[in-house]
Design a protein with these regions (language model features):
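Short, contiguous alpha-helical
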Residues: 8, 12, 16-19, 29-69, ...
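A ubiquitous short alpha-helical element
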Residues: 2, 75, 117-118
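Acidic catalytic patch
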Residues: 94-109
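Secondary-structure boundary/capping positions in well-ordered alpha/beta enzyme cores
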Residues: 28-29, 97
Length: 152
């Protein structure tokens, strides 16, 4: 199994949970904020999905495409589905050698990193915010929540 397939499985083990949590956010709760300084549920979900896609585009040395014209008019489930599929395609496009390529992220985070580290940074970011998302959906009243990660 190539590095791309291994990473894709790791990505999906977390992203499938993220998408399940996003699916629990009803239209009436998209503007929910646990505190006045918190991101809204919609903003948090979009931030997670788009950031991972952008980091993966950089790691795959491909131009980031604007996937939606009107984010606020797109359902969270559609955002999750499209960003997940596009991120999967980028991961699948990478060869084992691509994982070692140096990616210049000086404008974004001030350094250059191997592509594999860029992907791991994206995963750390997703895991961090997935914890936030668990809190949001709990506070929306949901008690039937998925495990932190799902294999298979």
């Amino acid at each position: 199994m190539g590095k791309n397939e291994q990473f894709k499985q790791y990505f999906l083990s977390h992203r499938n949970v993220t998408n399940e949590l996003i699916g629990k956010i009803s239209t009436e709760h998209v503007d929910y904020q646990p505190t006045p300084t918190s991101m809204s549920a919609r903003t948090l979900a979009h931030h997670m999905l788009k950031s991972f896609y952008q980091f993966t585009s950089a790691a795959a040395q491909q131009q980031t495409k604007e996937l939606f014209e009107k984010i606020e008019e797109t359902s969270l489930n559609e955002l999750a589905e499209v960003y997940t599929k596009e991120t999967e395609k980028l991961i699948e496009s990478m060869s084992d050698e691509d994982f070692s390529a140096t990616i210049d992220l000086t404008e974004m985070i001030g350094t250059k990193l191997p592509a594999e580290q860029v992907l791991n940074l994206a995963m750390d970011h997703e895991i961090h915010h997935k914890g936030n998302l668990f809190v949001y959906v709990r506070e929306m009243g949901h008690t039937d929540l998925p495990m932190f990660v799902k294999q298979g």
